[in-house]
C-alpha cells in the first residue's frame, strides 16, 4: 500500500519505534495521523512536531480501542493504516511472574492487536482496503531467555498477524508483522544489563532505521519484517532442527550465566535462595 495521503493510527507513539514511524509517515506525506500513547507529555510534543493528533488510550482496554476507532473516524474520516505498535517488556520467568503481570502483558502485547483488528477491520472492509502493521518481536519467532511472558505474548502476536493476513489478505487488507531484535528504545535502555546484552547480540538498531524499513515493507505488502537479517537464519535452523536449536539456546543460557552470575535466577527461573545453590 502506498502510504502517501493515507490516514494513519500509531499506538505506542510517544517514544522509540512509534515516534520514528510518525516522523517517517510525515515525510511520506500522509494525510493525517492519530498518535496514541498513555505518555501524553512526550506525545503532545511529538504531535506538534509532526502535525499529528494526540490521543490518550490504554491499548489493552477494548473500550479504549473502540473509542479510538470512533475518534479516528470523526477526525480523519476513516483509517487506512493501523500501526499497532505499543508493547511492554514482561521480563520474568514462570515462577516469578504473577497472574496480574501475565494479564497485563497479555492485554498489551496480544489483545491490543486483536482489539484493533476487531474494531477497525469493518471500516476497512467497507472502504475496500486497509492495512495493519503489528509490532511483535524476534522473541515471537525464536524466544526470549528469562522472559516467559514476553516470549509467549510475542509468539501469540505473530500468530495472530499471520492468521489475519491469511484470512483477509485477499479482501483488500494488508498485514505486516514487525519482528526486530534489539532496537535503541527506552524499553531496552531501561532494562537490566543482562536483558540489554541479550537483545543486542546482533547489534542495536536505531528506531529511525527500523521505521524506514517498516514503511518500505508496507509499500510492498511484505508480511514479515525482520530488520536484523540474522533472525531469518535463526528461524531456518529452528524449523529444520528444533532439537539443535533448543540445545543451542541452552548453551547460550550457560554462557550468559557465566558472564552475568547475578542473572542466574532470571535465566534459570529460580524463586528461592535454596534453588540458587
State each model region's role:
Residues 14-15:
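Conserved glycine-rich cofactor-binding loop
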Residues 137:
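Residue(s) in the substrate-gating loop at a strand-loop-helix junction
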Residues 117, 153:
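Active-site helix of classical SDR
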Residues 93-94, 101-106:
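Substrate-binding pocket helix/loop in short-chain dehydrogenase/reductase
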Residues 26, 30-45:
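Conserved glycine-rich Rossmann-like NAD(P)H-binding loop of the short-chain dehydrogenase/reductase
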Residues 166-232:
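SDR active-site lid
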Residues 41, 57-67, 99:
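The beta1-alpha1 cofactor-binding region of Rossmann-like NAD(H)/NADP(H)-dependent oxidoreductases
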Amino acid at each position: 500500500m502506498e502510504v502517501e495521503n493515507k490516514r494513519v493510527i500509531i499506538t505506542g507513539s510517544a517514544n522509540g519505534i512509534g515516534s520514528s514511524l510518525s516522523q517517517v509517515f510525515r515525510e511520506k506525506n500522509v494525510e493525517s495521523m492519530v498518535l496514541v500513547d498513555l505518555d501524553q507529555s512526550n506525545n503532545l510534543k511529538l504531535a506538534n512536531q509532526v502535525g499529528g493528533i494526540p490521543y490518550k488510550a490504554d491499548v489493552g482496554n477494548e473500550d479504549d480501542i473502540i473509542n479510538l476507532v470512533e475518534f479516528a473516524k470523526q477526525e480523519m474520516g476513516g483509517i487506512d493504516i493501523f500501526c499497532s505498535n505499543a508493547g511492554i517488556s514482561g521480563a520474568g520467568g514462570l515462577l516469578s511472574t504473577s497472574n496480574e503481570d501475565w494479564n497485563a502483558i497479555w492485554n498489551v502485547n496480544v489483545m491490543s492487536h486483536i482489539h484493533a483488528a476487531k474494531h477497525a477491520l469493518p471500516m476497512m472492509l467497507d472502504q475496500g482496503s486497509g492495512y495493519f502493521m503489528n509490532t511483535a518481536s524476534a522473541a515471537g519467532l525464536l524466544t526470549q531467555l528469562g522472559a516467559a511472558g514476553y516470549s509467549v505474548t510475542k509468539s501469540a502476536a505473530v500468530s495472530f498477524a499471520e492468521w489475519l493476513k491469511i484470512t483477509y489478505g485477499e479482501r483488500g487488507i494488508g498485514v505486516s508483522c514487525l519482528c526486530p531484535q534489539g532496537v535503541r528504545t527506552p524499553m531496552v535502555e531501561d532494562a537490566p544489563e543482562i536483558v540489554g546484552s541479550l537483545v543486542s547480540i546482533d547489534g542495536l538498531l536505531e528506531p529511525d532505521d527500523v521505521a524506514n524499513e517498516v514503511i518500505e515493507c508496507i509499500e510492498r505488502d511484505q508480511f514479515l519484517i525482520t530488520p536484523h537479517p540474522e533472525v531469518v537464519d535463526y528461524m531456518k535452523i529452528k524449523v529444520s532442527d528444533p532439537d539443535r536449536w533448543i540445545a543451542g539456546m541452552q548453551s547460550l543460557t550457560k554462557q550468559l550465566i557465566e558472564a552475568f552470575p547475578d542473572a542466574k535466577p532470571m535465566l534459570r527461573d529460580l524463586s528461592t535462595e535454596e534453588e540458587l545453590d
